[in-house]
């Protein structure tokens, strides 16, 4: 039994939801139109279809009297509008005349998502930018590491220089202390030697000694 007869008989508001699908040619860019087919059950002919995108009405179409489906050509943001097609989530709904010529609306169809492939140049540009950012990051990290190493090396050299200066100062102090000890010891030894010598008799020269007696030999006078 056709749905129209059932609707007139029962006045029910629960009529089947339509099916929705993309049909070729499929869009490859934002400038390409989007073709969406919306189909009611096979025995419902000449229904009025409404296409929604994100809860907003995009287009209204009536199916031919001998067909249960329509094909929407989305080329803009509104019904029949021109311009750039936009992707998103689409769904559709249809309506028929019920009892007492009251319009009866179906449930909403499933959603179909329309997206566009990323252009090659955008992908190449994104990869180039990502590579440039990565390279810049690596260069910055390398510079920071080298600066840190140079700073640590400079600190190590300063510490080594400080220790060398301290050791040199200690060596000089030890040498000065040794010289001072030797000088003090020599001074003490000289003082002791002076005290031990005391008054001594000066040696007399040979000229001051008493002259030895003169001896003479006399021969007898004959």
UniProtKB/Swiss-Prot annotation:
Residues 142-222 are cytoplasmic. The keyword Repeat does not apply. It is found in: Membrane. Its main location: membrane. Residues 22-120 are extracellular. It holds the Pfam family Ig_C19orf38. InterPro entries: C19orf38_Ig, HIDE1. Glycans are attached at residue 48. The keyword Hydrolase does not apply. Residues 204-222 have a biased composition (Low complexity). Residues 190-222 are annotated as: Disordered. Keywords: Glycoprotein, Membrane, Signal, Transmembrane, Transmembrane helix. GO terms for cellular component: membrane. It is a single-pass type I membrane protein. Residues 1-21 form the signal peptide. The chain crosses the membrane at residues 121-141. This is Protein HIDE1. It comes from Mus musculus (Mouse).
């Amino acid at each position: 039994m056709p749905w129209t007869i059932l609707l007139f008989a029962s006045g029910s508001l629960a009529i089947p939801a339509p099916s929705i699908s993309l049909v070729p040619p499929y869009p490859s860019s934002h400038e390409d139109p989007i073709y969406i087919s919306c189909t009611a059950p096979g025995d419902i002919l000449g229904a009025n279809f409404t296409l929604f995108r994100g809860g907003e009405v995009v287009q209204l179409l009536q199916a031919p009297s001998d067909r249960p489906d329509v094909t929407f050509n989305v080329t803009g943001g509104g019904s029949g509008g021109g311009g750039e097609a936009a992707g998103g989530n689409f769904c559709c709904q249809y309506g028929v005349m019920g009892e007492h010529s009251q319009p009866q609306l179906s449930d909403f169809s499933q959603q179909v998502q329309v997206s566009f492939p990323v252009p090659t140049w955008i992908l190449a540009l994104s990869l180039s930018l990502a590579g440039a950012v990565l390279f810049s990051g690596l260069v910055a990290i390398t510079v920071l590491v080298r600066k840190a190493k140079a700073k640590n090396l400079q600190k190590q050299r300063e510490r080594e220089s400080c220790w060398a200066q301290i050791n040199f100062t200690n060596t000089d102090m030890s040498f000065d202390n040794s010289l001072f000890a030797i000088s003090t010891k020599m001074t003490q030894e000289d003082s002791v030697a002076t005290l031990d010598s005391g008054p001594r008799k000066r040696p007399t020269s040979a000229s001051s000694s008493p002259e030895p007696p003169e001896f003479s030999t006399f021969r007898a006078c004959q």
